[in-house]
Design a protein with these regions (language model features):
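Polar/charged low-complexity regulatory segments
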Residues: 1-191
Length: 191
């Protein structure tokens, strides 16, 4: 039976969930990234329709905007791409694109934002993959059927160097399925 989690606020609940996911993913985000991830999750749970938008068009549209409007749109694109790649990878499949597509677009949005206003957006671009890994682990905390499938995990690891995806490939291939175990064990994890 699943245990009932009681936290005093929604922020504390998200914080606890992110911490549990970090432990499950064997990733430790710094306090700034952890806080940003919690706030992003809170923001998008209040407006779930935002994740279903066409991010590529928004990304292109941001080039036509200036100032605060452009900054907000780039941040939203980066945040949405993070959530889709981490929490809703099946959406990528439905749209007939790889998870790596959203990773690259999200990192680009954060990097452009960093280039324009600096701040910590460069850190978000650089640490996009570990944050995505934490979100993947969050999906799997209470439901192991939420794993991304083996081929998607392999592709994600190849494209991004995701350590969580690599672990999924190792776990999924331990029975000799599809991918030679000795090849995976010798994989370069320095992506």
């Amino acid at each position: 039976m699943t245990s009932l989690v009681l936290e005093p606020t929604s922020t504390a609940l998200w914080q606890a969930l992110v911490s549990d996911a970090e432990a499950a993913a064997n990733r430790q985000l710094d306090e700034t990234l952890e806080s940003y991830l919690v706030l992003t999750l809170m923001r998008f749970t209040q407006r779930p329709e935002l994740v279903s938008s066409v991010m590529a068009l928004e990304f292109l549209d941001s080039a036509q905007k200036a100032g605060q409007q452009q900054h907000a749109q780039l941040r939203d694109v980066g945040d949405k791409c993070l959530l889709v790649s981490g929490l809703f990878p099946q959406n990528a499949k439905r749209r007939l694109v790889s998870i790596g597509y959203f990773v690259n677009m999200g990192r680009s949005a954060y990097q452009q934002l960093h280039d324009k206003i600096h701040g910590f957006y460069g850190q978000l671009a650089a640490d996009f993959i570990p944050m995505m890994d934490v979100l993947h682990a969050m999906r799997e905390l209470n439901d192991q059927s939420q794993h991304i499938d083996l081929l998607d995990a392999f592709e994600l690891w190849e494209e991004t160097g995701s350590q969580h995806a690599l672990e999924r490939v190792k776990d999924g291939s331990s029975g000799g399925h599809m991918i030679k175990r000795d090849w995976i064990d010798g994989a370069d994890t320095s992506h």
